[in-house]
Amino acid sequence: MRKAALGCALAALCLLPTLTFAQIGFISSWLDMVTQTQSQQPHWITPLATTTPRLEQEFRYDIQWQTHNSGVTTDNYGVSKGLEIIPEKNVEVILAVPPYIVNNPDSPQDGFGDWQFLVKYRIAAGNEEHGNYILTAFYQISFPTGQYQEGVKSPVITPTLAYGKGFRNFDVQGTLGGGLPTGNNATIGRTILWNNTLQYRIRKKIWPETEFNFTHYYEGSHDGHSLLYITPGLVLGRFPIHNRFSFTFGGGFEIAATSFHPTNHIPILSIRFPF
């Protein structure tokens, strides 16, 4: 019995290097696929509020400080960002970390918001040498996991078409989609979401931008209203750290441009680690 156990242990030890090399080989092949996939699209930076049509691989953490018309301020830690990964050619998956919402003045009902994920499929793209454009489809769904009233009461599906076009150092990135609740329409309401970002690159790593974030509401408490935020901002990056690993950060300020606006004057901070 002891000899059999010893033999199994020795066999396992002999297999460990093989498994390790296999794992390293898998990771290396996967990262090579990611590099090739990203080389076939424009190399713009991801905007602050608009979801980029590019396929990106990074971990992202944002913070927003929202001021409501009532005078209450809300600190949003995370802003439904998280892990962005490219598992297959032309595909990206975003696994968001539920945001943590803090209401000021102090509230006993601070808590986590809804969890969501987003899948991108890149339909067509050309890098800077082959047209400098991209077209991507999104499928996003959020789940009512929020604590207290920090989320909505039903899952919300958001199909979206994203697009982008570059002209030398200037680019436009945009999305057009709709938020479709699977229930409680009278409370949650449906939305049309249209976002556009104008971006300019200076010295390769400095990206000033202006975003236009438009929402129109059907049903729900905001039925018939339209909302537009204009968001000037600046993103800096990508700063190499080691091999594929790099660092990007940016900030901006959302300003309501319509008479209807539940919140206004919203600072944004964004931190990203592309890999």
What are these regions (language model features)?
Residues 22-275:
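Transmembrane beta-barrel domains of Gram-negative outer membranes and organellar outer membranes
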Residues 1-31:
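Cleavable N-terminal export/targeting peptides
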